[in-house]
């Protein structure tokens, strides 16, 4: 099986997962929307969630969306500057257009195969800067670890500030005990840790023998470069600036969700805490293995908006407005721009060097 065919197959699988979840969410919301129409005495022939969603999208305030896109660019500029700070201890003074462009291309790649962006990002920076892929990947892992910690802080804040609404909503809408029993009874939860621990133990016991093989040497080189990249955080020049960029990144993410409230009439009265809650739930939805969080993002954003009495149909429209403007438009548009732009920039630089 060729690499191209494998990549196409993976892309189709992940898009299939995303569309399946999105269809499930849409189907359930359509049923709920029809029930609402019957209660209001509206003819079911004029009760299409699809038509409502298109009408909501066309009536959205794109002035607010433009500000959201600006916040998106600011967050990624800070991410690129923070990445430069991680690359510098490796002896690399990376150019901003290379790190920024690699990040935008990585977001675009994530729309095809989830989490492939991290690999693409390390490949792109190693192509345009003098750094090994393994070391670049190590810095990206550090970058993502910091993101996970930041998300955990955001989750903690949302839970504390919205505990009352969350608690009431889950009591009324979900049987948590039954859900937990189903999750805990899933066999893979027991099998996966056993396999993982066994693999670690056997690798540790046979490490010296493994290093004597060609495969072992290759693995050691990868792990060593990976480790150097991760450890670069302890040699960051200015920790205060590094933390500042981390705060900017996640503040912009939050602000993007909050400002989208004002682009859509049914959510325009929601406050800062609601923005944090919806942002956190949406972030968890994007983690799901589907392109850009397709389907899972819509479901979790809908659940979060339910805390604040936003109906399912309106919640679905809001999720689509955010998903299309950020996850699709921004990631595709800016990703394609830098796919075209970076080779042109470096071709010009090569010609200038040759001319001199």
Regions found by a protein language model. Give the residues of each.
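Transmembrane alpha-helix termini and helix-breaking/packing motifs in multi-pass membrane transporters
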Residues: 154-173
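Hydrophobic alpha-helical transmembrane segments of multipass integral membrane proteins
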Residues: 66-74, 101, 105, 109, ...
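Short intracellular "coupling" helices and adjacent cytoplasmic loop segments at the cytosolic face
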Residues: 91-94, 104-119, 230
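Predominantly cytoplasmic-facing regulatory/coupling regions of multi-pass membrane proteins
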Residues: 1-102, 169-283, 325-356
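Alpha-helical transmembrane segments and their lipid-water interface positions
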Residues: 79, 83, 110-121, 147-158, ...
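Membrane-interface alpha-helices at helix entry/exit sites of multi-pass transporters
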Residues: 96-101, 116-118, 131-148, 310-321
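Transmembrane alpha-helix interface/packing and boundary motifs in multi-pass membrane proteins
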Residues: 105-114, 277-298
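Re-entrant/interfacial helical elements at transmembrane boundaries that shape
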Residues: 118-127, 291-307, 336
């Amino acid at each position: 099986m060729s690499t191209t065919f494998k990549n196409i197959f993976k892309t189709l699988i992940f898009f299939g997962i995303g569309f399946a979840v999105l269809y499930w969410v849409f189907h359930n919301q359509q049923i709920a929307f029809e029930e609402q129409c019957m209660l209001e005495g509206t003819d079911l022939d004029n009760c299409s969630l699809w038509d409502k969603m298109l009408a909501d999208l066309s009536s959205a305030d794109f002035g607010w969306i433009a500000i959201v896109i600006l916040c998106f660019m600011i967050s990624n500029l800070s991410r690129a500057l923070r990445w430069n700070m991680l690359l510098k201890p490796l002896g690399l003074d990376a150019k901003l257009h290379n790190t920024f462009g690699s990040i935008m291309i990585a977001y675009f790649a994530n729309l095809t195969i989830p989490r492939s962006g991290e690999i693409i990002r390390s490949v792109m920076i190693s192509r345009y800067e003098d750094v090994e892929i393994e070391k670049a990947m190590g810095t990206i892992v550090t970058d993502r670890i910091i993101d996970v910690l930041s998300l955990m802080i955001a989750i903690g804040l949302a839970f504390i500030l919205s505990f009352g609404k969350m608690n009431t909503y889950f009591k009324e809408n979900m049987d948590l005990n039954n859900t937990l029993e189903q999750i805990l009874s899933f066999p893979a939860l027991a099998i996966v840790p056993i396999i993982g621990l066994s693999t670690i133990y056997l690798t540790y016991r046979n490490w010296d023998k493994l290093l004597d093989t060609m495969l072992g040497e290759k693995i050691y080189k990868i792990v060593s470069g990976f480790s150097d990249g991760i450890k670069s955080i302890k040699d960051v020049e200015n920790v205060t600036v590094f933390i500042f960029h981390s705060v900017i990144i996640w503040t912009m993410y939050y602000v993007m969700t909050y400002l989208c409230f004002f682009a859509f009439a049914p959510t325009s009265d929601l406050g800062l805490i609601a923005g944090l809650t919806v942002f956190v739930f949406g972030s968890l939805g994007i983690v799901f293995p589907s392109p850009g969080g397709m389907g899972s993002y819509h479901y979790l954003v809908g659940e979060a908006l339910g805390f604040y009495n936003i109906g399912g149909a309106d919640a679905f429209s809001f999720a689509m407005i955010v998903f299309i403007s950020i996850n699709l438009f921004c990631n595709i548009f800016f990703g394609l721009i830098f796919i075209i732009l970076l080779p042109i920039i470096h071709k010009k630089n090569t010609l200038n060097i040759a001319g001199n």
